[in-house]
């Protein structure tokens, strides 16, 4: 290895899957140095993108309070499944590696938020809360002092975003409507209060999503005695102006808090929403045609509409329905639990009516799986 021309080992290492990069770095000091070189990293990520475009892509999955990198292969609209204990290479969803180690195997990860190839992880133990921003590609982490000590099952919202004018990442924190929103600037290394008096509150039971450096959540109007129904909408936080945008309409009406709603993104270009009414076993997914902090429009045709009663169970109701879609292959993958809440399941729906369920193993009853897209990044954490 030491006598080989530099470009030869670089060419070989470029073909290593992203999921195997960490053990390769620990094998040889020279390989580790080479893999952390900027020119190599650009070639490696370009090679990974070619592979992703060709047949498979990666997502980050939080499951049982741990974070994993999942490899997904949905070739030719043919979905083959295997149990998590199977070593079969035909499985369309594979748990490649546990992603994060905080130096404490007892530390549970209760929330994950992805932005620009960075992961914001909220880690909670009985004695402390930790905020960690992590770049999985470099293996770099940055710890932040939290402003509040949480219980694992508290309701709160965090988001990671990007200030385009200052080229700086920021963290937004919200707890309840009675607590002020706080924002953390990576450059100043300080938390500060935001001057916001909302006429709404974030629906904190539902996870938000990052798109183009901004964050989006489901929200609803503050309760008043004259309200006869819930009014849900999308809400954007612009990390550049540090302001919330106006309520953005959803493609469905009359949602209530018992319904299942989830938001995702596709190709870092558009938002996607999932909706299942609590009293009707119909699952619908829509994709935006335009999305900005102050405006949204939806494709006139629903991306996917299926009957869970026919495909899954006569009485099946998704709980959180964290998901992603593949527009080209016309497939949606929804992560949730089984009917008894004992197993983690990936439900794979095709727009043509096809269906498969991939068993991901035993489930911690108090932790629902959460999936987000993952695109490797060369961003350095200072």
Swiss-Prot record:
Pfam families: FBA_1. InterPro entries: A_thaliana_F-box, F-box-assoc_dom_typ1, F-box-assoc_interact_dom, F-box-like_dom_sf, F-box_dom. Residues 1-44 form the F-box domain. This is F-box protein At3g19470.
């Amino acid at each position: 290895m030491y006598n080989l021309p530099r470009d030869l080992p670089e060419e070989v290492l470029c073909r290593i899957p992203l999921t195997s990069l960490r053990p390769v770095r620990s094998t040889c000091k020279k390989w580790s140095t080479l893999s952390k070189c900027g020119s190599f990293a650009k070639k490696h990520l370009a090679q990974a993108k070619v592979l992703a475009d060709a047949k498979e892509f990666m997502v980050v999955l939080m499951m049982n309070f741990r974070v994993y990198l999942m490899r997904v292969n949905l070739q030719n609209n043919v979905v083959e499944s295997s149990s998590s204990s199977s070593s079969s290479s035909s499985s369309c969803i594979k748990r490649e590696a546990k992603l994060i180690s905080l130096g404490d195997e007892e530390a549970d990860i209760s929330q994950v938020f992805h932005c620009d190839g960075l992961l914001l992880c909220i880690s909670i133990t009985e004695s402390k809360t930790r905020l960690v921003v992590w770049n999985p590609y470099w293996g770099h982490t940055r710890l932040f002092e939290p402003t509040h000590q949480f219980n694992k099952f508290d309701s709160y919202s965090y988001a990671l975003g990007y200030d385009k004018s200052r080229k700086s990442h920021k963290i937004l924190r919200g707890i309840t409507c009675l607590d002020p929103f706080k924002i953390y600037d990576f450059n100043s290394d300080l938390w500060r209060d935001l001057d916001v008096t909302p006429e709404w509150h974030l629906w904190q039971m539902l996870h938000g999503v990052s798109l183009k450096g901004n964050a989006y959540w489901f929200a609803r109007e503050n309760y008043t005695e004259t309200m006869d129904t819930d009014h849900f909408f999308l809400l954007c936080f612009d990390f550049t102006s540090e302001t919330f945008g106006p309520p953005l309409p959803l493609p469905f009406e009359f949602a209530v808090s018992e319904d299942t709603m989830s938001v995702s993104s596709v190709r870092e270009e558009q938002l996607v929403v999932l909706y299942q009414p609590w009293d009707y076993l119909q699952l619908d997914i829509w994709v935006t045609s335009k999305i900005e902090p102050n405006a949204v429009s939806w494709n006139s045709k629903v991306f996917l509409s299926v009957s869970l009663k026919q495909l899954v169970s006569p009485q099946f109701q998704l709980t959180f329905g964290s998901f992603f879609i593949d527009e080209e292959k016309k497939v949606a993958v929804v992560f949730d639990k089984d009917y008894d809440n004992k197993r983690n399941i990936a439900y794979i729906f095709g727009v043509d009516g096809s269906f498969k369920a991939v068993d991901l193993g035993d489930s911690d009853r108090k932790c629902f799986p959460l999936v987000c897209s993952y695109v490797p990044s060369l961003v350095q954490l200072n």
